[in-house]
C-alpha cells in the first residue's frame, strides 16, 4: 500500500528551498490538472514552460513506454538509437552540426560556458576568458550559471564566485559594448528574459551583440531553455529574430516534461571538446531522447507554429479585455506563448498574491519577479481551455482588486 502523504509532509521532510502551493496535483490530462481533493485547475504554468504538449500526451506516453520496454540506461560509454535520432533531428532543424545531451537547462548552459572558455584558451590563449552576461538574467543554479545570471539574490550566499563574469544592462547595446572586448570569450543572452520579467530582446540588440562578438572573436550563446521548442511561434527564438548564435542551449519543453537538456553548436567549436573534457552520466538517456524525439516530431511543424501564433493572439485579446475591466496591468508583453502581465504601481509586488488567488479560482499561473504575472501554457492548449482559464484568472483579479485578498 502506498504511503498517504499531504502538503504538510513537504515541510517535514524536504530541504526548504521551495514553498510549494498548498495543494498537491495528482493527475493531469492536456491543460488540466486535478489535486488530491479532486479540484480541477487549468494549467497556464506548464511546469515553467516545460509541458509544451500538456499533461499525459498519448504520443509521448507511447514513446516512453515503448523505450521503457527495451532498456533504460547504459551510461556514456555507449550510445543509443534514440539519442542519435534526436541529435539528427536537432541538426536538421537548426544551424547546429553537433549536439551535447544533458539533463537540464543549467547543465546545458554550464557546457556552453565551458566550451566557450576552452575554445578561446585553445585558439587564442588563457587571457581570453571574460564572459559578458546580463542583469536580471537566469541561466541555472550551478555555481557557474548562477554567477552568469546577474541576480545577486541567487548568488550572494555562495561566494567566492567564478571570476571574469560581467553584467551589462539587457536591451542596452551601449552597455554591452562597453564590456565586450578582445578578452571576452563569450556573451550569453536570453532572447526573451523569462525569470527577469518576460522581456523580449529587440532585433537591434541581438543583431548588435552578433556584430560585437564577430568583431572581438567571442562566441554568442543563446540561452533558449525557456524560449525554445516552439514557445515563441518558431522552433527556436533565434529564427524569429534572424540572428544565429554560435551555441544554443535548450531544455524544458524539449522533453515535454521528461528531464533533458542539450547544447547545440557547430563542428568547429565542438572540436575542442575532446574525449574527457566534459561529460554526464545520464545525458542522452534513451528514455529522455525517445520522448524528446516525439516532442520534436509534433512541434516542429508549420501547423503547430501557426497555432502558437493564433493562441498568442487569443491570450492577448482576452488579457486586454481583463485589463480594461480591472486596470491592473501597465503592459502585456512577450512572444508566442511566453507572456507577462506587468502590474501597475498600485499592485507592485503582488504578482505572487495574484498567482495564489488564481489557483484558488482554479487556474495555475507563474510569476517573473514581484511585479509580473507570467503565462507559459501548453502550445496545444484549446480555445475552450484558454477561455475558461482566463475567466478564472479574471475572477482572481476581481477578488484582488476588491480587497478580498491580502498580502498576509
Swiss-Prot record:
Q: In which pathway does it act?
A: Amino-acid degradation; L-arginine degradation via AST pathway; L-glutamate and succinate from L-arginine: step 3/5
The cofactors required by this protein are: pyridoxal 5'-phosphate
Keyword terms of this UniProt record: Aminotransferase, Arginine metabolism, Pyridoxal phosphate, Transferase
**Gene Ontology molecular function terms on file:** identical protein binding; pyridoxal phosphate binding; succinylornithine transaminase activity
| Domain of life according to the entry | Bacteria
Query: Gene3D superfamilies under this entry?
Result: Aspartate Aminotransferase, domain 1, Type I PLP-dependent aspartate aminotransferase-like (Major domain)
The EC number(s) given in the record are 2.6.1.81
Name the GO terms of the biological process aspect.
alpha-amino acid biosynthetic process; arginine catabolic process to glutamate; arginine catabolic process to succinate; ornithine catabolic process
Report the Pfam families cross-referenced here. Answer: Aminotran_3
Q: Which InterPro entries match?
A: Ac/SucOrn_transaminase_bac (IPR017652), AcOrn/SuccOrn_fam (IPR004636), Aminotrans_3 (IPR005814), Aminotrans_3_PPA_site (IPR049704), Class-III_PLP-dep_AT (IPR050103), PyrdxlP-dep_Trfase (IPR015424), PyrdxlP-dep_Trfase_major (IPR015421), PyrdxlP-dep_Trfase_small (IPR015422)
Q: Which residues carry this modification: N6-(pyridoxal phosphate)lysine?
A: 252
Reactions catalysed, semicolon-separated, are: N(2)-succinyl-L-ornithine + 2-oxoglutarate = N-succinyl-L-glutamate 5-semialdehyde + L-glutamate
UniProt entry tagged with the keyword rRNA processing:
no
Similarity section: Belongs to the class-III pyridoxal-phosphate-dependent aminotransferase family. AstC subfamily.
Its job: Catalyzes the transamination of N(2)-succinylornithine and alpha-ketoglutarate into N(2)-succinylglutamate semialdehyde and glutamate. Can also act as an acetylornithine aminotransferase.
Designated name of the protein: Succinylornithine transaminase
Amino acid at each position: 500500500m502506498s504511503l498517504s502523504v499531504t502538503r504538510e509532509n513537504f515541510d517535514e521532510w524536504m530541504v526548504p528551498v521551495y514553498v510549494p502551493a498548498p495543494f498537491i496535483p495528482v493527475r493531469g490530462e492536456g491543460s488540466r490538472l486535478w489535486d488530491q481533493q479532486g479540484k480541477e485547475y487549468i494549467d497556464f504554468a506548464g511546469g515553467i514552460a516545460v509541458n509544451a504538449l500538456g499533461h499525459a500526451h498519448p504520443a509521448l506516453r507511447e514513446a516512453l513506454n515503448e523505450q521503457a520496454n527495451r532498456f533504460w540506461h547504459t551510461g556514456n560509454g555507449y550510445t543509443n538509437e534514440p539519442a542519435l535520432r534526436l541529435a539528427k533531428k536537432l541538426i536538421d532543424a537548426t544551424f547546429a552540426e553537433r549536439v551535447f545531451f544533458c539533463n537540464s537547462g543549467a547543465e546545458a548552459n554550464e557546457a556552453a560556458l565551458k566550451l566557450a572558455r576552452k575554445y578561446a584558451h585553445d585558439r587564442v590563449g588563457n587571457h581570453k576568458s571574460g564572459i559578458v552576461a546580463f542583469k536580471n538574467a537566469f541561466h541555472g543554479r550551478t555555481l557557474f550559471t548562477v554567477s552568469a545570471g546577474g541576480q545577486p539574490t541567487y548568488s550572494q550566499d555562495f561566494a567566492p564566485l567564478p571570476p571574469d563574469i560581467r553584467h551589462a544592462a539587457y536591451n542596452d547595446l551601449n552597455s554591452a559594448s562597453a564590456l565586450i572586448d578582445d578578452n571576452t570569450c563569450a556573451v550569453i543572452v536570453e532572447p526573451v528574459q523569462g525569470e527577469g520579467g518576460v522581456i523580449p530582446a529587440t532585433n537591434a540588440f541581438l543583431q548588435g551583440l552578433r556584430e560585437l562578438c564577430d568583431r572581438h572573436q567571442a562566441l554568442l550563446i543563446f540561452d533558449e531553455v525557456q524560449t525554445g521548442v516552439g514557445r515563441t511561434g518558431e522552433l527556436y527564438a533565434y529564427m524569429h529574430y534572424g540572428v544565429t548564435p554560435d551555441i544554443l542551449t535548450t531544455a524544458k519543453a524539449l522533453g515535454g516534461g521528461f528531464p533533458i537538456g542539450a547544447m547545440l553548436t557547430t563542428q568547429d567549436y565542438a572540436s575542442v571538446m575532446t574525449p574527457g573534457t566534459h561529460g554526464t552520466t545520464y545525458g542522452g538517456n534513451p528514455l529522455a531522447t525517445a520522448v524528446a524525439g516525439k516532442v520534436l516530431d509534433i512541434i516542429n511543424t508549420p501547423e503547430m507554429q501557426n497555432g502558437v501564433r493564433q493562441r498568442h493572439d487569443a491570450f492577448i485579446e482576452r488579457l486586454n479585455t481583463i485589463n480594461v475591466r480591472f486596470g491592473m496591468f501597465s503592459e502585456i508583453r512577450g512572444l508566442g506563448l511566453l507572456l507577462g502581465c506587468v502590474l501597475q504601481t498600485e499592485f507592485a509586488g503582488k504578482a505572487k498574491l495574484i498567482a495564489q488567488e488564481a489557483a484558488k479560482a482554479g487556474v495555475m499561473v507563474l510569476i517573473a519577479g514581484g511585479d509580473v504575472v507570467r503565462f507559459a501554457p501548453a502550445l496545444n492548449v484549446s480555445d475552450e481551455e484558454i477561455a475558461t482559464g482566463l475567466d478564472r484568472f479574471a475572477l482572481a483579479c476581481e477578488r484582488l482588486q476588491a480587497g478580498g485578498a491580502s498580502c498576509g
